Amino acid sequence: MKKLLKTAAVAAAAAIALAGCSSGGSSDPSNVSPTGEVKPREISWLLSRPADGAVINIMKKLADDYAKDHPGFSLNLITTPDRPSYIQKLETLAAANKLPELFDTDATPFAQQLAKQGKMVDAEKLLKSLDVYDNYRPSALDYQRFDDGSLRMIPFQFELEFIWYNKALLQKAGVSVPKSLDEIPAMCTALRSAGITPFAIDGQDQWPLERYVAYQPFREAGPDFIQKLKKGEAKFTDPAGKKAVEWLASLGKAKCFQDGFSSQGYSDAQNQFTSGQAAMYNIGTWELPSLATDKLNPAVRNDIDFFTLPTTDGSVTAANEFVSPSGIGMAVNAKTYDPLVSDFLKFALTKYPSEYAATGALSPTTNVETAVPANATPLYKKALEKANDLGDEQAMPWDTQLDPTTNGRLQQELVLLVQGNITPEQFTSTMDSTIAQNAPKFFK
C-alpha cells in the first residue's frame, strides 16, 4: 500500500508540474506533413508492452527494414512492461519536457493535459495524411479518443474481453452460464459448495479487479456514468454507482475469487484456470495462444469455452457491447516530429497490420484477415468472429479514465471491499470524497 500511495503522490506532483510548464516546442500538433529532407538518426519509443510481444517484435523488424534504405536510422525501444512503473516514468519525463519521439499512453486525464499543451501530434490528421485512417476499426480508434472526441494515440492492437469458463466444473456444481450479472454471486456460492474456485484473478496487478467495478454501471447507465463520475458529476451514491459497490461486495461475500487473490499475479491466475482449479477466468483475446490452441492443458482443452459480459434486467447496453480495448496507444511527440519520423511512420503503419494479423492476433484495422494458427482449437475462430458483431458502445476500463490519485485509491479500496475489510458505505464515502478532492485538478 505504501508503494501505491507513493506512486499516486508522484503522479499528482508530476501533474502539478506539468500544469505549470509550457508546451516546450514550437511544433504545431496539427502539422502532420512536415517539409524538408529526411535525415536518418536514432529515434526512441517509450513503451509499456511485453518485451517479447508481437507489437515490439514486428516494429523491430519494420525498423530494420526501413534502415536498409535509410542508413543511420534506428529505433530505440525503451520498454517498461510494468504499468505502474511505466506511468511514473512517463509522467516524470513529461514534467521535465524530455519525452522521446514516440511514447505509449492510454487516453487518461494526464495524457489529455499533454494534448492540451500541444505535446502530441493530431493522430487523426496524421492517419488521414498517410491514407490509412479509413482502414482502422472505428471502435479501435474510439478507445483511444479523449472525452472531446480528439484522437492523439494510434492503436496497435484490438482485443475482446471474455469470461472463459470450464464446462465440466460448471456442470459439476450444477450451474449454467449466467444470463445476468446479478446471477454471478449465487453462481459463485454454488461453485464453492462443490469445492471449486469460481474465478481466477490476477489481484497483484490490480487492473483485473478494477474491470469488475465498471460492469454494473455500464449495463445500468451506459458509458456516460464513468465520464460523469471521474469529473465528480456523478457519485457512487447514485443508482449505478450503488449497484456497482453492492455487487462487488456480494462477489466478495460469495468468495468468487481465489483465496489470497490480492497477492497472486498474472501467471498464478492463468495457471489456476488452465490447470482446472478455477471455473472462470476473465481475460482478453491476447490470451488466445494459451487458451485456444494445443498449448492448453489436454486435461481441460475440450472443456473450455467463453461467454461475453452478461447483461442485466433493464440493461441500457446490449449483449454485444462489452470491453473491447485497442490497448495502450502510441502518441507522437509534436516537439520532435520531423520529416524522418513522418516518413518512418508512413512506412511502418502501412506494413504493420498484415504483419500483426499474420501472428494470429486481431488487427486494429479491417483491411487484413487474421491468420488462424494451425494448432488452434475451434474456439480460436469463434473468438475472432465476435469482432464482426460488436455494438456501437464499449465498456471503458476505469483505470484509463480516472485521474491518477483517484485511480490508485480505487484500486486499494476495491481489494478491501471484496475482502470484507470495509463496508460498502465506507467504500462509497471514501471514493466520493477522493474524487471530489482530485478531479478538479484534471477536469477544469
Please provide the spans of the model-predicted regions:
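Conserved N-terminal structural module of periplasmic/extracytoplasmic solute-binding proteins
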Residues: K3-A14, C21-Q112, Q117, S129, ...
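Glycine-centered hinge/linker elements that transmit conformational signals in sensory
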Residues: A190, K231-F261
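Extracytoplasmic/periplasmic substrate-recognition and gating elements
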Residues: K68, A173, A254, K295-G360
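A structural signal for short loop-to-beta-strand junctions that line the ligand-binding cleft
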Residues: P100-E101, Y133-A168, T197-A200, T317-V323, ...
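C-terminal capping/gating helix-and-loop segments adjacent to ligand/active sites or protein-protein/ligand interfaces
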Residues: L229, L362-E369, K382-A436
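Hinge/lid segment of periplasmic solute-binding proteins
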Residues: T108-F162, P185, Y212, D305
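Extracytoplasmic/periplasmic solute-binding protein
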Residues: D148-F156, E161, P185-A234
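Short, solvent-exposed loop/beta-turn-alpha elements that line the ligand-binding surface or hinge
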Residues: E124-Y136, E220-K243, K295-A299, T311-E321, ...
